[in-house]
């Protein structure tokens, strides 16, 4: 590919996929601070958003080999970039880069691509759940405790929420075992295993394992000896159906492209809006802090907020100089600021000290 991105400190911020479900939320958050360029496959879809935000619209179809060129101050990828086109162009042009779309194996590949290229500008791989918000909260809790031995994440997916088609891409990975850190050792686990019930906010939710990038990065960045992420759904029937499909082996024998629609159709039925909610438990020694994150504006809004905070970080506009090279969201200079940064966008963070030896209704594990 011959894409060219050039760094211009006074230039606009480029949002690749900028008028999709998450991109729309991010554009609205970012527009008061920076001029924007929004790209996608069909610019007509972004016309109303461009008028609302004052953004420029351009076509950049990542599946089309036609080259793209722009002079920008930073770029955020909020759409799948399977061939690393945006990443490579940003590194080549010295442009600060944020990505919130990659699942674990693609994040690992991106980190390798970036490391080999030797970037001089920041490369923020912020694909932990909800655009890195889980990792930000884990870092905040770890900072309060003086470290993080274990990190347990429990997600409650609201089936009434708005969602783009990429949001259920994790369904394609439910037939693939993955590696986690447990008690300081690497273990291979099955998706949807270790099911249990966890109280997330006021709701007892059945959750099971899912492959997410923070389970790879948190042991590296926070030195967590155990990192676990599980997911459950607002409909107990949907959770039960998913677990039943797993027991029948559907996600093993139905891994091919011809089954993509069937896999994603188990959950992809976007509604008019719901609440994004997750719980993060961090333990250091005998102390555990439990945080519940609630965003009444939904998961697209919460993911966009993670992208916005990543953008501020790579631009050095969060009270500290911009980093260089590959970084993850939890590597932030001021973790104590996370609650106020979330609250500024209407996201509620409640932290409490957990009672030792809590059962399933307590800790996310």
Predicted features, each with a name:
Residues 13-30:
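N-terminal Rossmann NAD(P)H-binding glycine-rich loop of SDR-like oxidoreductase domains
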Residues 16, 143-272, 276-284:
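Active-site-lining helix/loop region of Rossmann-like oxidoreductase modules
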Residues 37-38, 98:
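Conserved beta-strand positions in the Rossmann-like core of class I SAM-dependent methyltransferases
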Residues 39-43, 61-62:
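N-terminal Rossmann-fold cofactor-binding loop
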Residues 89-107:
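ADP-ribose/adenylate-binding Rossmann-like module
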Residues 101-121:
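Rossmann-fold NAD(P)-binding glycine/threonine-rich loop
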């Amino acid at each position: 590919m011959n894409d060219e991105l050039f760094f211009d400190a006074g230039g606009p911020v480029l949002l690749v996929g900028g008028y999709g479900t998450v991109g729309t939320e991010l554009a609205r958050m970012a527009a008061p601070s920076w001029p924007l360029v929004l790209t996608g496959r069909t610019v007509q879809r972004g016309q109303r958003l461009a008028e609302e935000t004052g953004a420029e619209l351009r076509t950049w179809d990542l599946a089309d080999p036609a080259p793209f060129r722009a002079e920008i101050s930073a770029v955020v990828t909020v759409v799948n970039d399977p061939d690393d086109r945006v990443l490579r162009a940003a590194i080549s042009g010295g442009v600060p880069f944020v990505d919130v779309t990659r699942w674990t194996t693609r994040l690992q590949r991106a980190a390798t691509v970036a490391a080999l290229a030797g970037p001089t500008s920041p490369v923020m791989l912020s694909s932990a759940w909800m655009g890195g918000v889980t990792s930000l909260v884990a870092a905040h809790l770890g900072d309060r405790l003086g470290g993080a031995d274990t990190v347990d994440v429990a997600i409650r997916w609201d089936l009434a929420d708005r969602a783009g088609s990429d949001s259920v891409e994790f369904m394609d990975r439910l037939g693939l075992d993955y590696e986690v850190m447990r008690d300081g050792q690497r273990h291979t686990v099955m998706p949807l295993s270790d099911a249990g019930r966890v109280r997330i906010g006021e709701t007892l939710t059945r959750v099971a394992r899912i492959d997410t990038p923070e389970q790879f990065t948190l042991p590296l960045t926070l030195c967590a000896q155990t990192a676990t992420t599980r997911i459950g759904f607002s409909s107990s029937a949907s959770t039960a159906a998913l677990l039943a499909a797993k027991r029948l082996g559907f996600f093993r024998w139905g891994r091919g492209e011809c089954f993509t629609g069937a896999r994603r159709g188990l959950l992809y039925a976007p509604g008019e809006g719901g609440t994004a909610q997750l719980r993060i438990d961090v333990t250091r020694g005998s102390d555990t802090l439990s945080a519940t994150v609630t965003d009444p504006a939904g998961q697209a809004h919460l993911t966009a907020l993670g992208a916005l905070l990543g953008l501020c970080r790579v631009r050095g506009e969060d009270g500290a100089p911009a980093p260089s090279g590959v970084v993850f969201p939890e590597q932030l200079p001021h973790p104590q600021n996370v609650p106020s940064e979330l609250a500024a966008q209407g996201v509620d963070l409640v932290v409490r000290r957990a009672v030792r030896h809590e059962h399933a209704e307590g800790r996310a594990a």
